[in-house]
């Protein structure tokens, strides 16, 4: 599954364009699609019951980074604060890969762990992201 705006650049005949709000059925499972740009313009998350597969949008302890071509910190703020953090706090996130102290975490627990999820507004988030990048080491 790929976000609909990336359909022309994905070189495969095995693709299914999706958009925000779509329900994708895989066998007996139904996943809701959330378009969550910021890390990349075509980033998506998938909600399955009380599990959110966040890809590179949200990790345990932090958000995705916005240092690549096409990344946008303001878009990431909107995706995280107006989409993901609006979900029930007991939702468990499953990131695309492991960068945190554990593999999965609830939204509420992640908020308490990460300054990036405690920003007062978009400007504070941008400041927190810049601070994270400036203090970043190979380990984090």
Segments and roles (model prediction):
Residues 36:
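Hydrophobic alpha-helical positions that pack around
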Residues 11, 18-20, 39-40, 78-82:
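A generic local structural motif
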Residues 30, 41-139:
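Metallo-beta-lactamase
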Residues 1-32, 112, 116:
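Active-site HxH/HxHxD metal-binding segment of metal-dependent hydrolases
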């Amino acid at each position: 599954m790929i976000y609909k705006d990336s359909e022309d650049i994905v070189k495969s005949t095995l693709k299914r364009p999706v958009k925000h709000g779509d329900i994708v059925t895989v066998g007996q499972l139904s996943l809701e699609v959330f378009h969550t740009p910021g890390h990349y313009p075509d980033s998506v998350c998938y909600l399955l019951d009380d599990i959110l597969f966040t890809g590179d949008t949200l990790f345990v302890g932090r958000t995705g980074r916005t240092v690549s071509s096409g990344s946008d910190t303001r878009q990431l703020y909107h995706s995280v604060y107006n989409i993901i953090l609006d979900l029930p706090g007991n939702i468990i996130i499953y990131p695309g890969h492991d960068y945190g102290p554990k593999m999965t975490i609830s939204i509420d627990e992640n908020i308490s762990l990460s300054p990036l999820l405690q920003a007062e507004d978009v400007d504070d988030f941008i400041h927190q992201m810049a601070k994270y990048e400036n203090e970043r080491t190979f380990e984090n």
